[in-house]
Regions:
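Two-component/phosphorelay signaling modules centered on CheY-like receiver
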Residues: 44-61
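Conserved phosphotransfer cores of two-component systems
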Residues: 58, 74-76, 98-105, 126
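Acidic catalytic/metal-coordinating carboxylates
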Residues: 65-68, 91-94
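Active-site beta3 strand of CheY-like receiver
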Residues: 76-82
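Receiver (REC) domain active-site loop signature in two-component systems and cognate sites
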Residues: 87
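Alpha4 helix (beta4-alpha4-beta5 surface) of REC/receiver domains from two-component response regulators
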Residues: 94, 115-130, 143
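C-terminal output helix
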Residues: 136-146
Length: 152
């Protein structure tokens, strides 16, 4: 008889919730690891909605602040990051800049409740993969994340 032990690092998905995910591991019995997605928003409702939308196709972690996101990034590489721009403390734009210093190939999708075409152009010039204004449709954000992860 042969036994196989697989270590799992369980980390809270959201400090507001009492749920956990295995970071960087194969989920369920899938033979191929799921793409990883980090969702950063100080609004628990938006965070939860995005987690619910993507968690069946992506290994998702959520963070309520950029500082918390940095902690996740210390132990995990993400295939894409979605972040709100207007957060207390470190903004989503600053998060984008720090992600680029670490790994400029990681696509960062910025979301905001306020925006203009000028904002869109300037944020893309800073290196954002995309800029999506709230309210956005679920189809729209799904398509943007899919393009970010697949590179298409």
């Amino acid at each position: 008889m042969c036994a196989l032990a697989v270590p799992f690092d369980f980390t809270p998905v959201d400090p507001c919730e009492n749920s956990y995910v295995a970071i960087g591991r194969v989920r369920y019995n899938d033979a191929v690891p799921m793409p990883t997605l980090l969702i950063v928003d100080d609004d628990a409702t938006v965070r939860g909605m995005l987690y619910d939308l993507f968690s069946d196709r992506y290994e998702c972690n959520t963070a309520s602040s950029a500082d918390e996101a940095f902690q996740y990034m210390e132990v995990e590489h993400y295939d894409a990051i979605i972040t709100d721009i207007a957060m207390p403390g470190i903004t989503g734009v600053e998060l984008l800049k720090r992600v680029q210093l670490r790994d400029e190939a990681t696509p960062v999708i910025l979301i905001s409740g306020k925006g203009s075409e000028h904002d869109n152009q300037s944020l893309l010039a800073l290196g954002a993969f995309a800029y999506v204004t709230k309210p956005f449709s679920l189809d729209e954000i799904e398509q943007v994340v899919e393009r970010a992860v697949t590179g298409k």
